[in-house]
Amino acid sequence: MSSLRTADDTWDIATSVGSTAVMVAASRAAETERDEALIRDPYARLLVTGAGTGIWESVLDAKFVETVAAADAEAAAIFEHMISYQAVRTHFFDAFFTAAAEAGIRQIVILASGLDSRAYRLDWPSGTTVYEIDQPKVLEYKSATLAEHGVEPAATRREVGIDLRHDWPAALRGAGFDPSRPTAWLAEGLLMYLPADAQDRLFEQITELSAPGSRVAAETAGVQAEDRRQQMRERFERIAEKFDMTASLDIQQLIYEDPDRADVADWLDAHGWTATAVSSQQEMRRLDRWALPADLTDDDAFSNFVTAEKQS
């Protein structure tokens, strides 16, 4: 159970779940500026610097990990791993959308889109519409920030400002979504912020809205032991204090670690989809991006990347 969440909580880009989007964008920005980057997101830095979230803006400093390493080598390894994880995750789901577009899908839905910039940075075929669903203030911040810098979407982009715990299918249809057309759906960095029953309901709604040939991709929720969570919390508090950075939000307290959460691939297989799951650890090692020492490796704490296609 999450200790900082309520049944109808809301947020903007600098608070609660909204601020986690800044963390992810900071990692994308850091990755983009590497010589051998897995992904290129030219807009991530813009989105981070205007958000005012302290520690995540610090990640933009090219010397950040090196500086942290001088004080706490293990914390530096964790930060390096976090950046690499986000790069690998982004790379994986970018490829998912590229394959969907090559298969002729022209209707895209990004759930809890946060500061996702794919509508702007991917090479979408003509006729593609990207629907982004998130809290209104989060969507407003992203679109306003990019517009101020003259950045235009690479596809038709439609904002659906609504909480996923409300009637988002009706709002999506109201924005022009056509359930009779195949759709590519993405739930990236989302499921861990939903209770188990809400996760099931989300996939039920996706299934109801999906024509045959639709595709869905999701990052599953990992589970971390409480003692390890506390250890991480204390370490990051020390780092923030030592380097005079704004204390980071305790992301672990925003997450629902429900023990009865359904396995996403199994759920999809049982509801008319054909699913495949790839371990994020496996994908990170395949791309030579694993940064954690062996004593910090916990299989249950890491997510899977699931993709599936609707059969009927």
Curated annotation (Swiss-Prot):
S-adenosyl-L-methionine binds at D134, D163, L164. Keywords: Methyltransferase, S-adenosyl-L-methionine, Transferase. GO terms for biological process: methylation. GO terms for molecular function: methyltransferase activity. The keyword Methyltransferase applies. Exhibits S-adenosyl-L-methionine-dependent methyltransferase activity. This is Putative S-adenosyl-L-methionine-dependent methyltransferase Mkms_0097.
